[in-house]
Amino acid sequence: MGKYFGTDGVRGVAGADLTCEMAMLIGRGAAAVLTSSTGHKPRILIGKDTRQSGDMLEAALTAGLCSVGADVESLGVVPTPAVAYLVRKYNADAGVVISASHNPMEFNGIKIFAGTGYKLPDDVEEEIEAHIDDKCAGIPLATGDGVGRVTRRIDGIKDYVEHLYESIGGDLSGLNVCIDCANGASAEVARQLFPRLGAKCTFLGVSPDGRNINAGVGSTHLDNLEKAVVEGGFDCGIAFDGDADRCLACDEKGQELDGDKIIALLAMAMKDKGRLDGNTAVVTVMSNLGFVKYMESQGINTEKTAVGDRYVLENMRENGYAIGGEQSGHVILLHHATTGDGELTAGKLLRLLAESGKKMSELNGIYAQYPQVLVNVVANATQKAAYKADE
């Protein structure tokens, strides 16, 4: 982790930790680094979730990018993994997401994907941080026709839905599913995708107002979904977080399927089809021992990394593995995506359910979780840096 960039970019309370001034500096620094590395005027995509502060930060970030000569294509409200996919499809030089994922609405963040669809390498983030530290003093500002342009891109959701539809495949006809979109970025994609795949869908958390993202809904608040599934007689429930890079689920009895369980089910299906590269699933040190023991019993190897999907992805890419993720619901399916994708994960899980002929509770019962206690500690950027320095 760098001084400003954590495992998921720059994050903090919008207007306090993450100010407009900071967003503009990030934009200027990123545009300068990309111009230097590509040798041309960079094209940069920007997507965001539904937070009230998103428009403010996008305006400041865009001003910073354009002031150094980068062209910006605004995607509007789209899931984080959509930006990672579209930056490759549209052959852009980078993609930026303005989101704080599963966090409350007062938080926001800025995460940058390279033109490859992967998060920026550490050394590139360090270059941007160096520019931030000196207030971008050494970066010349563009003038005249050198100033960047801003365009609104309206085809992003359509192209992303098409990608998901082709990647998921299969027929979900006969499934009755309750889907919680966390009042976040997943709503429009979900409403187009899952009915098209054949599922009968009821949606929760699809009325964002800028303030209600993740508020009692989504993957960090499963109670309402679990209750709705049981009372409504649904086959299962699906929950995304605010930017849809996470997916959790519950069975028809209202019992949770966490990221470990979803990874285990998908890894088994991939193994059966000869698609489990390296016969290995990559998880983090937070994964439950029950998951590890089950995978051993099925002849599948597991590798553990530090907490953070960034570290999971690094291990997968270095070793050629196809699936990995976190207990929290980040699942990376490297045959189809370069980052965790909640809606892709949900589609693959629902396809597995439809093809199995079983109830979701039967799939959920493949192993029992061992007793486990996880404790979250709140720390600001300075405290995190001090902790890392003391390791």
Segments and roles (model prediction):
Residues 1-63, 67-68, 150-175, 381, ...:
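An N-terminal, well-structured beta->alpha segment
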Residues 5-6, 46, 72-77, 97-98, ...:
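General beta-strand structural signal in soluble alpha/beta enzymes
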Residues 13, 108-232:
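Gly/Ser/Thr-enriched, mixed-charge loops and adjacent short helices
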Residues 32, 36, 40-107, 192-250:
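N-terminal small/polar loop signature for handling phosphorylated ligands or for N-terminal nucleophile
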Residues 37-43, 137-151, 174, 234-237, ...:
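Flexible, glycine/charged-enriched surface loops at secondary-structure junctions
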Residues 47-49, 179-181, 251, 335:
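Short glycine-centered, acidic/aromatic-flanked micro-motifs in structured strand/loop junctions
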Residues 126-161, 166, 252-325, 332-333:
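Proline/glycine-rich low-complexity loops and linkers
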Residues 236, 273-391:
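Phosphate-binding and adjacent anionic-ligand microenvironments
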